[in-house]
């Protein structure tokens, strides 16, 4: 086995082992009914990103620890005002995980783990109105290990401005999901693709999206419908008038009255 193949196998098996260990509590939480659930998720690996430490509350991201800047980053500013978390706590956990990773690499039998390919969907954040700013969301789901290369294409050309992404978010089945965002102005002429590369895919996966123009009815159809509606309205008025007149006449008909 080539050295690079061996390292690939090591990465896969170690990542699977670490995810099982640190997401194990999520599996148990799924069997218990609870009003609220908080989740810490942490992993390290030999491929970028080299690690992650984050916290969720009821599946909403609260904060993560920036491993390069060594600081806590809150998803919303209000969270940081209401709660606190020392980044050193997350960094200490990452250091322990790295030590465990090195030990597992040395003791691993290099058994290849399964790479789970992602499921990808693309959708707009808001209802689409041509010419109105919006955000395209690319949701990459149910993949393992947490290694992705995601790019946006507009009319087949690479887009680098107006892009953003989430962290790798844990799932209760030990896999991950992730969001990538693209701010754009919908146009009838433009089309977009979210291009995803992952070890579980034989080739890059492109998920296509383009604005759907509203269906315009021909003028002749609109005219026919308007005329039909007008005719039905007139018929209703005539029928109603006839029924009212008949009702009034029957009320004044002597034969309809009882015996004196």
From Swiss-Prot:
Changing residue 82 to T: In allele DPA1*01:07. Residues 210-222 are annotated as: Connecting peptide. The gene is HLA-DPA1. Residues 116-209 are annotated as: Alpha-2. Residues 1-28 form the signal peptide. PANTHER family: HLA CLASS II HISTOCOMPATIBILITY ANTIGEN, DP ALPHA 1 CHAIN, MHC CLASS II-RELATED. It is a single-pass type I membrane protein. This is HLA class II histocompatibility antigen, DP alpha 1 chain. Residues 29-222 are extracellular. It is found in: Cell membrane; Endoplasmic reticulum membrane; Golgi apparatus, trans-Golgi network membrane; Endosome membrane. Glycans are attached at residues 109, 149. Residues 118-210 form the Ig-like C1-type domain. Disulfide bonds join 138-194. The keyword Disulfide bond applies. Changing residue 127 to A: In allele DPA1*04:01. Gene3D superfamilies: Class II Histocompatibility Antigen, M Beta Chain, Chain B, domain 1, Immunoglobulins. The chain crosses the membrane at residues 223-245. It comes from Homo sapiens. Changing residue 158 to P: In allele DPA1*02:01, allele DPA1*02:02 and allele DPA1*04:01. Its main location: membrane. Changing residue 54 to T: In allele DPA1*01:09. Heterodimer of an alpha and a beta subunit; also referred as MHC class II molecule. In the endoplasmic reticulum (ER) it forms a heterononamer; 3 MHC class II molecules bind to a CD74 homotrimer (also known as invariant chain or HLA class II histocompatibility antigen gamma chain). In the endosomal/lysosomal system; CD74 undergoes sequential degradation by various proteases; leaving a small fragment termed CLIP on each MHC class II molecule. MHC class II molecule interacts with HLA_DM, and HLA_DO in B-cells, in order to release CLIP and facilitate the binding of antigenic peptides. Changing residue 259 to P: In allele DPA1*02:01, allele DPA1*02:02 and allele DPA1*04:01. Binds peptides derived from antigens that access the endocytic route of antigen presenting cells (APC) and presents them on the cell surface for recognition by the CD4 T-cells. The peptide binding cleft accommodates peptides of 10-30 residues. The peptides presented by MHC class II molecules are generated mostly by degradation of proteins that access the endocytic route, where they are processed by lysosomal proteases and other hydrolases. GO terms for biological process: adaptive immune response; antigen processing and presentation of exogenous peptide antigen via MHC class II; cellular response to type II interferon; immune response; peptide antigen assembly with MHC class II protein complex; positive regulation of immune response; positive regulation of T cell activation; positive regulation of T cell proliferation. CDD domains: IgC1_MHC_II_alpha (cd05767). The keyword Transmembrane helix applies.
């Amino acid at each position: 086995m080539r050295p690079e193949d061996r390292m690939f196998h090591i990465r896969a098996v170690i990542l699977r082992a670490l995810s099982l260990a640190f997401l194990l509590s999520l599996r148990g939480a799924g069997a218990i009914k609870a009003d609220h659930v908080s989740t810490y998720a942490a992993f390290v690996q030999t491929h970028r990103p080299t690690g992650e430490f984050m916290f969720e509350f009821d599946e909403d991201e609260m904060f993560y620890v920036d491993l390069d800047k060594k600081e806590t980053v809150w998803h919303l500013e209000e969270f940081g005002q209401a709660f606190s978390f020392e980044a050193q706590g997350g960094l200490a956990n990452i250091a322990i995980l790295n030590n465990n990773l090195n030990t597992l690499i040395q003791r691993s039998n290099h058994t290849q783990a399964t790479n789970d390919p992602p499921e990808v969907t693309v959708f707009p954040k808001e209802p689409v109105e041509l010419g109105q700013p919006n955000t395209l969301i690319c949701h990459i789901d149910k993949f393992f290990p947490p290694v992705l290369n995601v790019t946006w294409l507009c009319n087949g050309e690479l887009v680098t401005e107006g892009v953003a992404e989430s962290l790798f978010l844990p799932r209760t089945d030990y896999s991950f999901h992730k969001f990538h965002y693209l701010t754009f102005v919908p146009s009838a002429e433009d089309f977009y693709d979210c291009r995803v590369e992952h070890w579980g895919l034989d080739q890059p996966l492109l998920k296509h999206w383009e604005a759907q123009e509203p269906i315009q009815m021909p003028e002749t159809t609109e005219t026919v419908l308007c005329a039909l509606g007008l005719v039905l309205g007139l018929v209703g008025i005539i029928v109603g008038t006839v029924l009212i007149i008949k009702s009034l006449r029957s009320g004044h008909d002597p034969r309809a009255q009882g015996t004196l």
